[in-house]
């Protein structure tokens, strides 16, 4: 299912596979501090019965590692690899693009079994095409239409500011004042602005009607770069 969702975002991924590696090989895959944490967690969760099971997943932008142990048996480590098209080769996680690797992080919000989690994400659109960002939000809204899960995120992608995905009271702006302090306020503060379509909403935002846009002084930049105007 995860591979299907990833493929639907035009990542080129056709499948996922786990490859078992020796615990000693982890030293070549994860940083020393992560390797130490794994050792400490295995020690802290030593089995008390043969039926005891322990598992953990560790990931960052370069690796996706799973550790499992059953009873008094030796722990087993696996690394996630990806397959593309009909290729027989499996690719390392770190070989994927920044956007694809980041997309893995968002699978949690789509596949979570919880009905009341709040996910907070900074710069949702980072490394994503604008269309991908929009579809991700659309899927979240559909998956969690009947539960209390919430997605709170920041973005510089103004095209996502759409009534198709959000109510007016769900769109908020951040504006920094002259002292460097940021103020957070909702679109609902402009309830009489008449922006009832997405095109109108984006136009007013880019015109600075709602604030939250950078104040760019090109003349200062040109002067600093010795660029003559005209």
Label every PLM stretch briefly.
Residues 1-103, 109, 204-208, 212, ...:
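Phosphate-coordinating catalytic segments in nucleotide- and nucleic-acid-processing enzymes
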Residues 76-215, 227:
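Switch/communication elements of ASCE P-loop NTPase nucleotide-binding domains
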């Amino acid at each position: 299912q995860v591979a299907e969702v990833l493929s639907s975002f035009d990542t080129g991924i056709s499948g996922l596979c786990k490859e078992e590696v020796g615990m000693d090989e982890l030293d070549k895959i994860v940083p020393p501090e992560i390797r130490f944490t794994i050792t400490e967690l295995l020690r802290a969760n030593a089995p008390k019965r043969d039926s005891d099971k322990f598992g953990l997943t560790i990931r960052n932008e370069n690796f996706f590692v799973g550790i499992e142990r059953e009873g008094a048996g030796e722990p087993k480590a696996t690394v996630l690899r990806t397959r593309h098209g009909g290729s027989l080769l499996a690719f390392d996680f770190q070989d994927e693009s920044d956007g694809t690797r980041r997309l893995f992080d968002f699978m949690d919000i789509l596949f979570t079994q919880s009905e009341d989690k709040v996910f907070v994400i900074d710069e949702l659109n980072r490394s994503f095409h604008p269309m991908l960002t929009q579809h991700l939000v659309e899927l979240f809204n559909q998956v969690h239409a009947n539960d209390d899960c919430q997605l709170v995120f920041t973005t510089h992608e103004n095209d996502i500011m759409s009534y198709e995905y959000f109510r007016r009271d769900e769109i908020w702006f951040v504006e920094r004042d002259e002292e460097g302090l940021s103020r957070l306020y909702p679109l609902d503060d402009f309830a009489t602005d008449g922006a009832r379509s997405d095109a109108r909403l984006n136009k007013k935002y880019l015109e600075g009607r709602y604030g939250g846009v950078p104040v760019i002084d090109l003349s200062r930049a040109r002067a600093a770069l010795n660029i003559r105007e005209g």
